[in-house]
Amino acid sequence: PDLDPEIKLVKIPSLGLYEKKSKFFDVNPTELLNPLNLFEWLSVNSGGFPEPYTFGKRIKKIIKKNLDEYDVIHDNQSLAYELLFFQKKKPLITTIHHPISKDLKYQLQSTDDFFLKLLMRRWHSFLVMQKFVAKRLKKIVVPSNSSLEDIKNEFQVDENKMERVMNGIDLKLFYPDSKIKKIPFRLVTVASADVPLKGLDYLLEALSDLIKVYPDISLSIIGEQRKGGHTERLIKKLNLQKRVNFFS
């Protein structure tokens, strides 16, 4: 994060397996003597995503030593079990952008491969913890009305516990610039992740149809395209390689 020099940043240690070339072999055997490290290593190498769980265990150990130094604890959607401990000790706010269970539903709908569906469910196994914790939190911040409805329905969270704080844009940084020449028939969209939930399929299919009416139309996507992923395959299928650009 980009912090003021006076703000102290405490980095929570982990095995960092997702950053390594081999999640299985690139580990010092002595690190696995720690039970939590061993759990993380086994979980990742069996298709799980243990980071929300392991983060909670590690953050509790660190913060508990100096709990009096903290005025407020703000969780950004880890929804770890340890939040229920902190909630009894300090003012706690949790931001939930959207329930990840919706991602899982859309991903399951995007394939007929039974084995792949099992892997998807395995990766999202942390949702059991997140659903348990979310409904027991006293105050949750959400970024939109649709997120509020989704969290209420997916996680069974009381609407009165949620507060809408809409996403904003710094107009000192982002504003129309008359010096920049407008490109006719260019569309711009934002996709924070290359996953079915973001709905890029519908936009790309619509673009394919609009070419017949607007031959000069193009699409710029602010986001990263997953190499060899579903979106890349769809762009090739619709013959849109020269019409679509990604910027990240």
Language-model segment annotations:
Residues 74, 119, 136-145, 190:
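A short beta-strand/loop micro-motif in the catalytic core of glycosyltransferases
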Residues 2-57:
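A conserved catalytic-core segment of Leloir-type glycosyltransferases
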Residues 180-198, 204-207, 220:
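Conserved donor-binding/catalytic core segment of Leloir-type glycosyltransferases
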Residues 72-74, 86-116, 141:
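Active-site proximal beta-strand in glycosyltransferases
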Residues 218-223, 229-248:
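Nucleotide-activated donor-binding/catalytic signature segment of Leloir-type glycosyltransferases, i.e.
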Residues 146, 168:
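Carbohydrate-associated surface elements
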Residues 57-64, 100, 116-140:
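Membrane-proximal helix-turn-helix segments that form the acceptor-binding/catalytic region
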Residues 48, 62-80, 93:
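Short N-terminal targeting/anchoring amphipathic segment
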